[in-house]
Amino acid sequence: MAKLIEFNIEARRGLEAGMNTLADAVKVTLGPKGRNVVLEKSWGAPTITNDGVSIAKEIELDDPYEKIGAELVKEVAKKTDDVAGDGTTTATVLAQAMVREGLRNVTAGANPMGLKKGIEAAVQAVSARLSDMAIDIETKDQIASTASISAADPTVGEIIAEAMDKVGKEGVITVEESNTFGLELELTEGMRFDKGYISPYFVTDTERMEAVLEDPYILIVNSKISSLKDLLPVLEKVMQSGKPLFVIAEDVEGEALAGLIVNKIRGTFKSVAVKAPGFGDRRKAMLNDIAILTGGQVISEEVGLSLDAVTLDLLGRARQVVVTKDEATIVDGAGDSEQIAGRVSQIRKEIENSDSDYDREKLQERLAKLAGGVAVIKVGAATEVELKERKHRIEDAVRNAKAAVEEGIIPGGGVALLQASKAAEIEGLEGDELTGAQIVLAACTAPLKQIAINAGLEGGVVAEKVAGLPAGQGLNAANDEYVDMVEAGIIDPAKVTRSALQNAASIAALFLTTEAVIADKPEPVKAPAGGGDMDGMGGMGGMM
């Protein structure tokens, strides 16, 4: 395919135009008075959202250079969302501010590599200041406040705080769609471990890249599965039952993996395979934990069980299994509660008797997985559009609350960034490196200005006023009053703000140091077969 290529200012100008189109669509959603954006769907009703990453994903531009610019900024939003569950709009606003100011300086003759070094030094200093400002979360109310801001709904904040209170700060919280209206919290026996699907062909929900199995059988094998002949008897038995199959093994490869994938693609049989967690003796112990939780049996030569002789009563069961590329969650295993309690007390005894800190830590992880359970937030809504949007928002709020617990909270509403930006005034920087640091200093005011603009205020005036206020005080855009942000419950997780700043700076540095852009040349639109406007037939009238 032929390529288009642009250099220098023209290349960067195309990228910037694409970035601005995307950022302008996303930034209107920032703050408590942020607006909504309507997303047209190729089928079904349109979606109404104010979630930055959802809006960014929908934007596809015609111009090849603008398209690349928009894709780069999408990466900022997506990466921030993946790490922290929120801050996507803040990251986009920061990236736009840094790129705009940076390109102005590059056009004026600044050295892009010098600017990049200055930006990186300033971001490191501001990130460290944000971490220093962070306050550890101690109360349920603080968790509720953080999650409420992310979800823009106090009820959601309260239910997430309740869920974290029940399963612990490291516990598993999942969000499910419900047929009933409103929100409901349910605690179930469950376990999550850090192994994702072996092949993406197992995915059942392509939008979320998840494989979800309802009421599956669970095959637990302490060896590799490579022969389809060995696996076939158990597959046939499970297929006859009409249930899906979740396979946990040391590895699934070759014709066995191919057989599972082919059946999944054809739609004849739904299954997911993951590698067993842990190594050596620890893997054996974890597989036994899973077997007890699900009411199954570990298929192993050691206990005289071979794969080709497996019957359905040796398989585990669960209400649901959710597998992503990184982890698997078993919800509501069908194991006997007395056996689970016995296993828990056995692990507790092992913890007491262990004299190795490492072993004790791993045993405590197993105990948490087995005894902690899973909190399931069931969400319902009046329409499917609202349900999808609400579910996504709650999932983001859960990740946001976990980020707050992990690294603490800071004043929200763009205030912490503005006040931490003073750390970008680094002594010893000069020339283009100093200019790079000043770009970060100016960009750190952009989120607060945008929140003020969305609330109908003058951004520059608000930023100047907040800069003169005592630390931690800023604008409550919901009622246009200046308050102590933490006391008013306007807080952000430090991890969210830090990730947004670092990801924005990373992409800004890429923009500034780009000297050429190579894009696919759009193919000319072919005329439809047998086309023509039949003008040539005008003279046929005389033949009548």
Curated annotation (Swiss-Prot):
Residues 523-544 are annotated as: Disordered. GO terms for molecular function: ATP binding; ATP-dependent protein folding chaperone; isomerase activity; unfolded protein binding. It is an enzyme of class 5 (isomerase). It catalyses: ATP + H2O + a folded polypeptide = ADP + phosphate + an unfolded polypeptide. SUPFAM superfamilies: GroEL apical domain-like, GroEL equatorial domain-like, GroEL-intermediate domain like. Residues 529-544 have a biased composition (Gly residues). PROSITE patterns: CHAPERONINS_CPN60. Together with its co-chaperonin GroES, plays an essential role in assisting protein folding. The GroEL-GroES system forms a nano-cage that allows encapsulation of the non-native substrate proteins and provides a physical environment optimized to promote and accelerate protein folding. This is Chaperonin GroEL. It comes from Cutibacterium acnes.
